[in-house]
Swiss-Prot record:
Family: Belongs to the urease beta subunit family.
Protein name (Swiss-Prot/TrEMBL): Urease subunit beta
Catalytic activity: urea + 2 H2O + H(+) = hydrogencarbonate + 2 NH4(+)
Keyword terms: Cytoplasm, Hydrolase
Pathway(s) of this molecule: Nitrogen metabolism; urea degradation; CO(2) and NH(3) from urea (urease route): step 1/1
Length: 101
């Protein structure tokens, strides 16, 4: 073993196993690309993205940590969301929640 080396178990790793999911159609109505990170509170994303924000409240993208989804101007794509976990408190972002969900 090399110091700092990580040896993963064999087989596939399933991300967010058992988490309930919801799929939304999202359109970028703006004239600039919008990139959303893996742990961003999706309901508070850029106002140029058009989707059902009530459904997205308390949820984040179902993608690996540290990655992002990019929406080009005029693009519509489907995204899968999962609930935020932990204390389920949201602070910052666009300051639309600032507390418990």
């Amino acid at each position: 073993m090399i110091p700092g080396e990580i040896i993963a178990a064999s087989g596939d790793i399933e991300l967010n196993a058992g988490a309930p999911t919801v799929t939304l159609e999202v359109s970028n109505t703006g004239d600039r690309p919008v990139q959303v990170g893996s742990h961003y509170h999706f309901a508070e994303t850029n106002a140029g993205l058009s989707f059902d924000r009530a459904v997205a409240r308390g949820k984040r993208l179902d993608i690996p940590a540290g990655t992002a989804v990019r929406f080009e101007p005029g693009q519509t794509r489907s995204v899968t969301l999962i609930p935020l976990s932990g204390k389920r408190e949201v602070y910052g972002f666009r300051q639309l929640v600032m507390g418990k969900l």
